[in-house]
C-alpha cells in the first residue's frame, strides 16, 4: 500500500500550474494565516473576492490545512476576532467565520450520515422522484 519512491518524489515537486504551491504542516498553515490576514490584509476584502478561483489571495486557501488537521477552525476564528479588534470588523470578517461554521456543519453532518449523503434517497432514505412544475 502507499506510494512508490518515484511516485512520492514526483508528488513532492511543485506543480507550475498551481496558483498557490501548498506545503503541508502546521508551520506552513500558520504562515498562510499570517500572510492572508496580517501581511497582505486580504481579509478586508474577503467578501468581494472569496469566490475567485485563480489568484493566490482571492480566497483564504485554508481548506487543505483544515482538512488535514494542520490548522483548526478555532485558531482561524480567534485570529479573525483579533483582526476585528485591531483592524476592523466588516462583512468580510463575518463571512469568513460564517463559512467556517458551514464547513463544520457539513463535516459533522457527513460524519453522522456517512455515505447516505451521496445516495439518491439522501439522508432521509426517501425514494427520489421527478417533480414536474409547469
Tell me the role of every PLM-derived stretch.
Residues 1-128, 132:
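Glycine/tryptophan-enriched, flexible segments
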Amino acid at each position: 500500500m502507499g506510494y512508490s519512491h518515484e511516485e512520492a518524489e514526483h508528488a513532492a515537486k511543485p506543480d507550475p500550474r498551481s496558483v498557490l504551491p501548498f506545503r503541508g504542516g502546521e508551520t506552513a498553515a500558520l504562515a498562510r494565516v499570517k500572510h492572508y490576514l496580517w501581511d497582505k490584509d486580504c481579509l478586508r476584502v474577503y467578501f468581494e473576492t472569496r469566490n475567485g478561483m485563480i489568484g493566490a489571495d482571492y480566497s483564504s486557501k485554508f481548506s487543505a490545512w483544515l482538512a488535514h488537521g494542520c490548522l483548526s477552525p478555532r485558531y482561524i476564528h480567534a485570529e479573525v476576532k483579533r483582526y476585528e479588534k485591531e483592524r476592523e470588523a466588516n462583512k468580510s470578517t463575518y463571512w469568513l467565520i460564517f463559512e467556517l461554521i458551514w464547513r463544520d456543519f457539513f463535516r459533522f453532518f457527513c460524519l453522522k450520515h456517512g455515505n447516505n449523503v451521496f445516495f439518491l434517497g439522501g439522508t432521509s432514505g426517501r425514494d427520489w422522484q421527478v417533480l414536474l412544475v409547469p
